[in-house]
Amino acid sequence: MALRACGLIIFRRRLIPKVDNTAIEFLLLQASNGIHHWTPPKGHVEPGESDLQTALRETQEEAGIDAGQLTIIEGFRKELNYVAWEKPKTVIYWLAEVKDYDVEVRLSREHQAYRWLGLDEACQLAQFKDMKAVLQEGHQFLCSMAA
């Protein structure tokens, strides 16, 4: 049976885009262990929890951002399937916007750093092809909403 995890692709919008036209910035966390990879907050589903409850709990635990500080974006839900630690794993992501651009990020011991990044930089740090694709799809979804 595949391990199941859920998370939120957290983003914020700059009121004034940077020179490279980056108006949307994604929050990535750097793991404290292994290859110190960068991902959005995510974690394993606990018994009795819904997938979205898991994503919200993990975001609070790993980044210190609680559900009241976020707006879940309707219509975007992506599922990744891959092998981690020699076991099949399924991870489900939703998009969530922080209500306060300057929200405080408080990392747990599971992570050693965080960064707010435009799409190109986020894709460079996200080492895994599937993670890059989800970030690109999320960005495209957000841009299509604004059009």
From Swiss-Prot:
It catalyses: P(1),P(4)-bis(5'-guanosyl) tetraphosphate + H2O = GMP + GTP + 2 H(+); a 5'-end CoA-ribonucleoside in mRNA + H2O = a 5'-end phospho-adenosine-phospho-ribonucleoside in mRNA + (R)-4'-phosphopantetheine + 2 H(+); a 5'-end FAD-phospho-ribonucleoside in mRNA + H2O = a 5'-end phospho-adenosine-phospho-ribonucleoside in mRNA + FMN + 2 H(+). A motif (Nudix box) lies at residues 43-64. InterPro entries: NUDIX_hydrolase-like_dom_sf (IPR015797), NUDIX_hydrolase_CS (IPR020084), NUDIX_hydrolase_dom (IPR000086), Nudix_hydrolase_domain (IPR051325), Tetra_PHTase (IPR003565). Divalent metal ions. The modification N-acetylalanine is found at A2. Its cofactor is a divalent metal cation. GO terms for biological process: AMP biosynthetic process; apoptotic process; ATP biosynthetic process. Gene3D superfamilies: Nucleoside Triphosphate Pyrophosphohydrolase. Residues 2-139 form the Nudix hydrolase domain. It holds the Pfam family NUDIX. It is an enzyme of class 3 (hydrolase). Its EC number is 3.6.1.17. Inhibited by fluoride ions. The keyword Hydrolase applies. Transmembrane segments: none annotated. It comes from the Eukaryota. The keyword Nucleotide-binding applies. GO terms for molecular function: bis(5'-nucleosyl)-tetraphosphatase (asymmetrical) activity; GTP binding. Catalyzes the asymmetric hydrolysis of diadenosine 5',5'''-P1,P4-tetraphosphate (Ap4A) to yield AMP and ATP. Exhibits decapping activity towards FAD-capped RNAs and dpCoA-capped RNAs in vitro. This is Bis(5'-nucleosyl)-tetraphosphatase [asymmetrical]. The lineage of its organism: Eukaryota, Metazoa, Chordata, Craniata, Vertebrata.
